[in-house]
Amino acid sequence: MSAEHDQIRAVAWTGAGVRLLDQRRLPQEEIYWTIACVSDVAQAITKMVVRGAPAIGIAAAYGVVLAARARFSEAGSGWKQLLEADLCDLEAARPTAINLAWALARMQAIIQGLPDHRDPESALLVEARCIHEEDIAANRRMGELGTTLIEGSVGVLTHCNTGSLATGGFGTALGVIRHAYGKGRIEKVFADETRPWLQGARLTTWELLRDGIPVVLIADSVAPYLLGQGEVQWVIVGADRIAANGDTANKIGSYGLAVAARYHNVRFMVVAPTSTIDWNLSDGTRIPIEQRPPEEVLTLGGKAIATVGAEAYNPAFDVIPAHLIDAIVTERGVVRQPTHERMKALFG
């Protein structure tokens, strides 16, 4: 895969802090913030300055570095006790994305092995950078594996944003699209707008065009009609949490796409690193679903679009039943027609 289709990094460590591309401002403005305080990292996650399950985990890992730096400076050998509250704040920032808890668990393992009197920053920074670099490597591997499932030159539909903006780099579902496009396996990419935050319209179109990949934007409600027209052979999405049986939580609207894809005999691919799998959950009914503020539905661009007094229901995610998924692609391999037994067979 040539570098020309992978130019964006939404999360980076600068030494002074964690550098985040403010995804709320795209595509109108490209603004980067350097954040030096762990509470501001947690707020950036909650307010969706940074979003996408892998990117959230990476940002949180760097947030732990900032917290440890501050707590050791403040309390010396008592830094671990003060750090506990910071870790709790980070984990509570977004409840559905399991990558957040996974990254924090890795950082906590390093913390537990450090002596109280030692400055923890360098050891924690090494681990945070490993999490970041491993994510990029996993995404590139998933891009290769996902491409092997795509035959000929096809049309694909993707949902939300699952590229470099949502990860450490390259992307999950968009990583497959990037790699397959570079190999001549994809003729046309459709992206749906993804209400209410419009990640498809604002972020996916920006990212693909920035990296030289043509894209066609559709309204969310167009997707089932499009799938019935024969122009799309694969729907390719990411994931925020995958249960042990393959049930997959992803951005709201994914379940409806899976239903429409099955009805029209269009194949459905989920692309996510193994850190997204929650082996403690037997199925998707136990996945916690984040409820976002009603204002996100009742307003658009800061202006009211609904009559005063109307209420709004705003779950951020829904769950795709495993039987509607043709393949789950991870960096460790592909699970076709996922079940608990097939998931366990691949991952042991």
From Swiss-Prot:
The protein depicted here goes by the name Methylthioribose-1-phosphate isomerase
* Active-site residues, as the UniProt record annotates them: D240 (proton donor)
Which residues does substrate bind?
Answer: R51, G52, A53, R94, Q199, N250, K251
| Keyword Amino-acid biosynthesis assigned | yes
Any Pfam family the entry gives = IF-2B
Domain of life assignment? Bacteria
- What does the record give as the function of this protein? Catalyzes the interconversion of methylthioribose-1-phosphate (MTR-1-P) into methylthioribulose-1-phosphate (MTRu-1-P).
User: InterPro entries annotated for this entry?
Assistant: IF-2B-related, IF-M1Pi, IF_2B-like_C, Initiation_fac_2B_a/b/d, M1Pi_N, NagB/RpiA_transferase-like
Instruction: Spell out the molecular function terms from Gene Ontology.
Output: S-methyl-5-thioribose-1-phosphate isomerase activity
